Structures are given as structure tokens and as C-alpha cells.
Amino acid sequence: MQIEMTIKGLMVDPITNMPIVILRDKEGQRVLPIWVGIFEANAIALQIENISTPRPMTHDLLRNVIHDLKAAVQKVVVCDLQENTFYALIYLSLNGDTLAIDARPSDAIALALRTRAPIFVEDTVIDHAKTVDFTSEKNDADRLHKWLESLDPDDLGKYKM
């Protein structure tokens, strides 16, 4: 089952210093942190903060190409988690057909923000992510788990990229 999510915030992992996109379901019951690259986090942050750039960035270009081809982004879905790597699909409608295009979640999310498309996560991905150790060191995993558990949901919107 797909669960609609919203971006609750962007944070920096205190252990790896990598950006994390925090997705949360509309009821506030489920949260999914997704580690992303710095450039992708910047693309997401620019859109969240409504900051325009003088020239189109990569995700703006992709949005423009999709629009000019008379296609539309229906939704993006974080659909799988394999070997500590999240996978996503971008669903495009084009000439009455629906295409599912493989993408990194960070790119799919950045595009969804630019096209106002909904973001979904398969419930199995959320369930599986709870059991996966995303860090290589046990101590780091414990520290990260405690840090994520201690987060106040109100703090998530305070961290800007």
C-alpha cells in the first residue's frame, strides 16, 4: 500500500554530516529519513524556500522538458529499499499512457516539489527501513538511532539548507 508523505524538513546527520530528507505521512504516524547528496538536498531546499535561480537547475530543466512534451508528473513513489539504498519511481502521464521511470528518491522528490506532484512511499519500505542499519559502526548506529528518536517534530522545520 502506498502512503502519501510530505516533506517535514531537511536536516544534517550529525554523524556522517550528510543531508537527510525527513518524510512524514499526513497523519503524523510514520516518518522516513532518506539520506541524500548535498547537491540534491540543495535542489530540494531551493524549492522548499521558494528561491529562484537565474538559470534553470537540473530539476527545473527536467520539469520544463516534461511540460514542453505535454506530459505531467502524476506522482513519485519511494518503492524499494535494497542494500541500504532507496529506490523511487516517477509516474508520468503522456498521450494517455502512464510511464514509470526509475529514479533516485532525492531526484524524484526534487521533481515532485517543482511539479506539485504527490510523494508516496510503499508501506513495506517504511517497515523495512526500521530494521536496516544505515551506518557501518554499531556505536554510530546507536547514536543515530537515539538522535532520531529524540527529535522533537517541531524542530524538523527549523533546519535550513
What are these regions (language model features)?
Residues 1-161:
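Divalent-cation
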